[in-house]
């Protein structure tokens, strides 16, 4: 047991000694490297030498795409690597140390910034430690959160695709001092955290140069092709709008004497106004492009407004009669009582304006009454009976004319009601065709574009 304890004690002392030697070697190495090191001076042997910075981008999260303010917020890692000959050493002289971690604030940095920032934070990165290798290679991969400007193309919202770019380059050094070398044209997405509203279809970088007089300034531009996942807006915006448009069609299926026709149309118009305000909160205030969903809402609002006007007209027709000084014209009788009902598959309408049977009965009644010649030949007793019959006949004719007048008025009212039904049926089919056609024409290009992007 005593021997075991002695072995453990000797082993722990050797580890402590080894650890102490590593710490001492690293401390000595840091003092050696940074003795007289000036981080404000480019680490080159000759003043005309160019530092080549290997640059790459790794995206970890697409935080937000703000359509209203036209911003894209991302969390990325900036991969940077360059040669600093002042920070090289012989590993054998420092206990085999081949790499050390050094605070980036103590090193010369290539001051690479995002040009298209939108919040004033050009650097946007955390000053993490850098890895310095024995051969002078410096590797620095700081995390950064950027808000970059992105011009939104919302024509096909919510089936849209956006192309946002991020442009990186040195803020103060031209191409003769610091040159950017694109390591990989593809953005690293291995650790990308999926966004619930957007997916990245493509993310590639491209090197470019900006000329300014005699100087050239290299930069790297990364383009992100984003596609919106439209399920949310389809369920809570497009489908309700489609439902409201077809609900407008059903207004003409209600009976013409129902006062709820106008109430339904007005309620639909108010609902569409609310949806239009929701769209206005999402899209930017620009007159260059109007989203198709906005055009569709305007189309439906005009559609509903016309339905209200037509409904008022139909209700007016429904309550017309000869008593309101609206006699029915002959062409209205032929068109709305005879021809159109057959075309619209409605039950035939009885011609209520034929009075031949009544006139024949009245003529027959008059012919059966004794004339003046018969009166002269009649006896005095018969004259009394005939006079009584004539008075009775006059009363019957008066009652008959009154009854026919009332029946005529009722028939005219029924005819105007039938005309209102025919108008309702016409506008029902007309608005249904216009609603379906308009919906298809407006949404088909957006659906085609979105489906092509998925293939």
From Swiss-Prot:
Which CDD domains does this UniProt record tie to the protein? LGIC_ECD_nAChR_B3, LGIC_TM_nAChR
A Pfam family of this chain: Neur_chan_memb
Regulation of activity: what does the record state?
Activated by a myriad of ligands such as acetylcholine, cytisine, nicotine, choline and epibatidine.
One GO CC annotation = postsynaptic membrane
Instruction: Identify the residue ranges that face the Extracellular compartment according to the record.
Output: 21-229
Stored InterPro entries: Neur_chan_lig-bd, Neur_chan_lig-bd_sf, Neur_channel, Neuro-gated_channel_TM_sf, Neuro_actylchol_rec, Neurotrans-gated_channel_TM, Neurotransmitter_ion_chnl_CS, Nicotinic_acetylcholine_rcpt
Q: Where are the transmembrane segments?
A: 230-254, 262-279, 296-317, 426-444
| Disulfide bridge partners, by residue number | 150-164
Catalysed reactions, semicolon-separated: Ca(2+)(in) = Ca(2+)(out); K(+)(in) = K(+)(out); Na(+)(in) = Na(+)(out)
Cytoplasmic side of membrane = 318-425
Q: What molecular functions are annotated in GO for this chain?
A: acetylcholine-gated monoatomic cation-selective channel activity; transmembrane signaling receptor activity
Q: Where in the cell is it found?
A: Synaptic cell membrane; Cell membrane
Q: Which GO terms describe its biological process?
A: acetylcholine receptor signaling pathway; membrane depolarization; monoatomic ion transmembrane transport; neuromuscular synaptic transmission; response to nicotine; synaptic transmission, cholinergic
Leader sequence segment: 1-20
Per UniProt, the keywords (alphabetical) are:
Cell membrane, Disulfide bond, Glycoprotein, Ion channel, Ion transport, Ligand-gated ion channel, Membrane, Receptor, Signal, Synapse, Transmembrane, Transmembrane helix, Transport
Expression (tissue specificity): Relatively abundant in the developing retina and in the trigeminal ganglion.
Q: How does it sit in the membrane?
A: Multi-pass membrane protein
- Sorted alphabetically, which NCBIfam families does this protein's record hold? LIC (TIGR00860)
The text of the family note is:
Belongs to the ligand-gated ion channel (TC 1.A.9) family. Acetylcholine receptor (TC 1.A.9.1) subfamily. Beta-3/CHRNB3 sub-subfamily.
Protein role: Component of neuronal acetylcholine receptors (nAChRs) that function as pentameric, ligand-gated cation channels with high calcium permeability among other activities. nAChRs are excitatory neurotrasnmitter receptors formed by a collection of nAChR subunits known to mediate synaptic transmission in the nervous system and the neuromuscular junction. Each nAchR subunit confers differential attributes to channel properties, including activation, deactivation and desensitization kinetics, pH sensitivity, cation permeability, and binding to allosteric modulators.
The subunit field of the Swiss-Prot or TrEMBL record says: Neuronal AChR seems to be composed of two different type of subunits: alpha and beta. CHRNB3/beta-3 subunit is only able to form functional nAChRs when co-assembled with another beta subunit. Participates in pentameric assemblies along with CHRNA4/alpha-4 and CHRNB2/beta-2 subunits and with CHRNA6/alpha-6 as well, forming stoichiometries such as (CHRNA3:CHRNB4)2:CHRNB3, (CHRNA4:CHRNB2)2:CHRNB3 or (CHRNA6:CHRNB2)2:CHRNB3.
Output this protein's name.
Neuronal acetylcholine receptor subunit beta-3
């Amino acid at each position: 047991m005593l021997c075991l304890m002695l072995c453990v004690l000797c082993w722990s002392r050797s580890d402590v000694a080894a650890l102490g030697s590593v710490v001492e070697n690293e401390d000595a190495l840091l003092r050696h490297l940074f003795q007289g090191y000036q981080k404000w001076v480019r680490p080159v042997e000759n003043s005309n030498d160019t530092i080549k910075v290997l640059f790459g981008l790794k995206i970890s999260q697409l935080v937000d795409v703000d359509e209203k303010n036209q911003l894209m917020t991302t969390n990325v890692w900036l991969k940077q690597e360059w040669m600093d000959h002042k920070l090289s050493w012989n590993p054998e002289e420092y206990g085999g140390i081949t790499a050390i971690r050094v605070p980036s604030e103590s090193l010369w940095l290539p001051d690479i910034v995002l040009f298209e920032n939108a919040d004033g934070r050009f650097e946007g990165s955390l000053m993490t430690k850098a890895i310095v290798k024995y051969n002078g290679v410096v590797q620095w991969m700081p995390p950064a959160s950027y808000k970059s400007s992105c011009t939104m193309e919302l024509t096909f919202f919510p089936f849209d695709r956006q192309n946002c770019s991020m442009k990186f380059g040195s803020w103060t050094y031209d191409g003769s001092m610091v040159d950017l070398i694109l390591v990989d044209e593809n953005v690293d997405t291995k650790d990308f955290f999926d966004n619930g509203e957007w997916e990245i279809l493509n993310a590639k970088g491209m090197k470019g140069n900006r000329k300014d007089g005699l100087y050239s300034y290299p930069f790297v531009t990364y383009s992100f092709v984003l596609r919106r996942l439209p399920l949310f807006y389809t369920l809570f915006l497009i489908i309700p709008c489609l439902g409201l448009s077809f609900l407008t069609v059903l207004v003409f299926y209600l009976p013409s004497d129902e006062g709820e026709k106008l109430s339904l149309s007005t309620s639909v118009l108010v609902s569409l106004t609310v949806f239009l305000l929701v769209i206005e909160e999402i899209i930017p205030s620009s007159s260059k492009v109007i989203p198709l969903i906005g055009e569709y809402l305007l189309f439906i609002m005009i559609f509903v407004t016309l339905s209200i006007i037509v409904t008022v007209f139909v209700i007016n027709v429904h309550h017309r009669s000869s008593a309101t000084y609206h006699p029915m014209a002959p062409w209205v009788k032929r068109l709305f009582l005879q021809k159109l009902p057959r075309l619209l598959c409605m039950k035939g309408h009885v011609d209520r304006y034929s009075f031949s049977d009544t006139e024949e009965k009245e003529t027959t009644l008059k012919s059966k009454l004794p004339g003046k010649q018969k009166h002269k030949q009649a006896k005095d007793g018969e004259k009394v009976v005939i006079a009584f019959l004539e008075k009775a006949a006059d009363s019957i004719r008066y009652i008959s004319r009154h009854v026919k007048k009332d029946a005529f008025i009722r028939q005219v009212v029924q005819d105007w009601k039938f005309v209102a039904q025919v108008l309702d049926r016409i506008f029902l089919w007309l608005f249904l065709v216009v609603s379906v056609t308009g919906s298809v024409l407006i949404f088909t290009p957006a659906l085609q574009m979105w489906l092509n992007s998925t293939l």
